Amino acid sequence: MAIQLRSLFPLALPGMLALLGWWWFFSRKKDRLSSSDKQVETLKVGPAIKDRRLSEEACPGVLSVAPTVTQPPGREEQRCVDKPSTEPLALPRTRQVRRRSESSGNLPSVADTRSQPGPCRDEIAKVELSLMGDKAKSIPLGCPLLPKDASFPYEAVERCKQESALGKTPGRGWPSPYAASGEKARETGGTEGTGDAVLGENVSEEGLLSQECVSEVEKSEFPILAPGGGEGEEVSHGPPQVAELLKKEEYIVGKLPSSFVEPVHSEPVKDEDALEPQVKGSSNTSDRDLAGELDKDETVPENDQIKQAAFQLISQVILEATEEFRATTVGKTVAQVHPTSATQPKGKEESCVPASQETSLGQDTSDPASTRTGATASPSAEALPPKTYVSCLSSPLSGPTKDQKPKNSAHHISLAPCPPPVTPQRQSLEGASNPRGDDNFVACMANNSQSVLSVSSLGQCSDPVSTSGLEDSCTETISSSGDKAMTPPLPVSTQPFSNGVLKEELSDLGTEDGWTMDTEADHSGGSDGNSMDSVDSCCGLTKPDSPQSVQAGSNPKKVDLIIWEIEVPKHLVGRLIGKQGRYVSFLKQTSGAKIYISTLPYTQNIQICHIEGSQHHVDKALNLIGKKFKELNLTNIYAPPLPSLALPSLPMTSWLMLPDGITVEVIVVNQVNAGHLFVQQHTHPTFHALRSLDQQMYLCYSQPGIPTLPTPVEITVICAAPGADGAWWRAQVVASYEETNEVEIRYVDYGGYKRVKVDVLRQIRSDFVTLPFQGAEVLLDSVVPLSDDDHFSPEADAAMSEMTGNTALLAQVTSYSATGLPLIQLWSVVGDEVVLINRSLVERGLAQWVDSYYASL
């Protein structure tokens, strides 16, 4: 039990703190509700409250403020009162508001439902109410100023001009409903920061006009309602035009874009049809809103401090977590370029506040009017939970309008990284609505997706949809280009060979690995399915244990190639190969030599183990094999061909050769002379595939357009040549005659030599050379021409053709000639009689018998 309590103790303290926090929050909430009910009862008096409720119902965001955040009556009088005018301005007001919504390029569309009404509508409505009456009364105690984002300088200038012109008309006049706009426009001129020269001129002109407006304050003599404490006071009703002005003002202001007021924490905009019934709503709703706002103003400083601390703590944790996550998935170079790139949903309000906004906000804090404005606007911002800052994407990039060009475009994206999150919560919220921060926000968004370069280069982002599309589509492009940039180029001295191995790698792999890879494909063709030779075996090579190595710049072709072949009995072949070829792979990796098993179907009891490599690696491979197979004979049986070969030939594995010491059935397909023949093994499994190959080659090379051999023609190249009866056979070039543009070819399947023009030969497809060459060139053993002749006589040739034509024969290899051709003994079976053809030619007097004739040569 003690162990369980000890494990639960670390969780007890945070839980207690959480419970205390919730208790404190709900207790404060109950106190506010009880106090608000009392205040609502005291406010339900007189017809004057009804008129005030009509104006306040249209703008429930901000009502009256506490006395601690209001100005003295004298100062408020200067800010809120304008010179009188002679007639109501309902129609000009409608035109001005509509033009404001059209000309502002930084504002979202009217249909934007993510923003909602805020202090702007309340301030305008209260100013209108305060200026209506017959005689001037005391200036209200709580005449709050418009928030920073409530108006634009050029609109205020136009208002003041119209009010000044109308106010000079003699006679009875009515105060303008836009008295506070001139002073507020001057106040917001620093925080707007649109960067346009026209706006700057309007701000300076506005300052002069505002002074004229203030100079006419003392002339106004109209009753004004004091929403802060004048509960018993009445409001004198003006002419019927005032009611129209109020209704139109409420309707038009309700349609204004909500980015005037609160860009983030706000309620959805209500429909236009619902605005009129709301003005005529019950007094209970209005009183509750009034009481709620009065109580919220008292708790603004405490709530600001608590939420600001919690907001900064959560944002810092999320930012650190996302940076750590991206550091593991993105390369170091990208991480250094974008150190603050993070895609958390809750941290955008911090990372996307530009430095220019912070400076403007810092200047505004010194102004007491702006402090009161922030205190007035904060209750509506704090009344709702924070929402995702997606609304920032709707305002930065808007299309051009009739009055002005779009102020923000993808062309203005800054490549500077986003500033760190060091601003308080209120500054972040106010900065998010600053039209000046749109460019910097787009830059921050591009940094978060690591697509700054792509977005700035495209320059086509004219709306939020295309901006968000580029944010997603440019990520892969930047990632791939970053990967390419991080790949270092090869040094000048590092030149790859044709086999893909660099010179510097040869020092690790060893000298023999270079030529081993070069000669991989030379001896792999024609091997059986049990052969362990593979073309891509160089991929499995590792660094050998041998201490020998060559220099990085050495030429691997200069290394001497050693070929060692040993006979392996049939019962040891499986052990030598190993399960799934593991032991042969072990031998390759350990010794560094190339090793494969040649499986010949004619030698059923013996197979050949082929070893290629340098002397050191061959010795190491033989040593490993000898340790495991002590009864195995490691004598080299490989007989390299003489350098003076008269007839170049393909590698042995590409030819279907006759087995040594084994009698096999053959048929003679071509006869050069009586002692020189070409035979086929018609009992071999691959023999039947030759017929199908002939048909495919005939269909292929009967079509025009097959390319010819490149010139000069290379000796030993395999090609397709015309055969008998219009057929196309496989052939090998054995000699070239450049003076006559002719070559001598040897048919590799049907035997025989022929001299043809080069242009009649065709290039052969790779799939046509996979079948082993069926024609085996042989010589008769112990048979030579007569002493008087250098060649066999025509009679000998005819007799040989008669004995071998159209019949199956038995052949056995006895030895090899000096040119490498096998010497055979040939028997014909006639009934039960077996006739040795070699002896038969001698007995007929067409040849002479000579023992070891080719050996003596």
Swiss-Prot record:
CDD domains for this protein: KH-I_AKAP1, Tudor_AKAP1
Chain intervals for the UniProt region annotation (Disordered): 65-121, 165-198, 260-303, 336-437, 466-497, 512-554
GO cellular component: endoplasmic reticulum; mitochondrial outer membrane; mitochondrion
Signal peptide start-end: none
Transit peptide range per the UniProt entry: 1-29
Domain of life: Eukaryota
Domain Tudor, chain residue ranges per copy: 712-771
UniProt key word Transit peptide: yes
An annotated GO BP: antiviral innate immune response
Mutant phenotype after disruption: Knockout in diabetogenic agent streptozotocin-treated mice results in significant cardiac dysfunction which is accompanied by impaired mitochondrial function and increased cardiomyocyte apoptosis.
SMART domains reported in the protein's UniProt record: KH, TUDOR
Residue numbers of Phosphoserine PTMs: 55, 101, 103, 164, 527, 546
Keywords: Endoplasmic reticulum, Membrane, Mitochondrion, Mitochondrion outer membrane, Phosphoprotein, RNA-binding, Transit peptide, Transmembrane
Pfam families, alphabetized: KH_1 (PF00013), TUDOR (PF00567)
GO function terms (MF aspect): protein kinase A regulatory subunit binding; RNA binding
InterPro entries reported for this sequence: KH-I_AKAP1, KH_dom, KH_dom_type_1, KH_dom_type_1_sf, SNase_OB-fold_sf, Tudor, Tudor_AKAP1, Tudor_domain_containing
Region span, PKA-RII subunit binding domain: 306-319
Primary residence: mitochondrion
Domain KH: 561-625
Subcellular location: Mitochondrion outer membrane; Mitochondrion
Positions carrying Phosphothreonine: 401, 487
PANTHER family per the UniProt record, alphabetical: A-KINASE ANCHOR PROTEIN 1, MITOCHONDRIAL, TUDOR DOMAIN CONTAINING PROTEIN
Recorded domain comment: RII-alpha binding site, predicted to form an amphipathic helix, could participate in protein-protein interactions with a complementary surface on the R-subunit dimer.
Complex and partners: Interacts with SLC8A3. Interacts with CFAP91. Interacts with CLPB. Interacts with NDUFS1.
Name of the protein: A-kinase anchor protein 1, mitochondrial
Protein encoded by which gene: Akap1
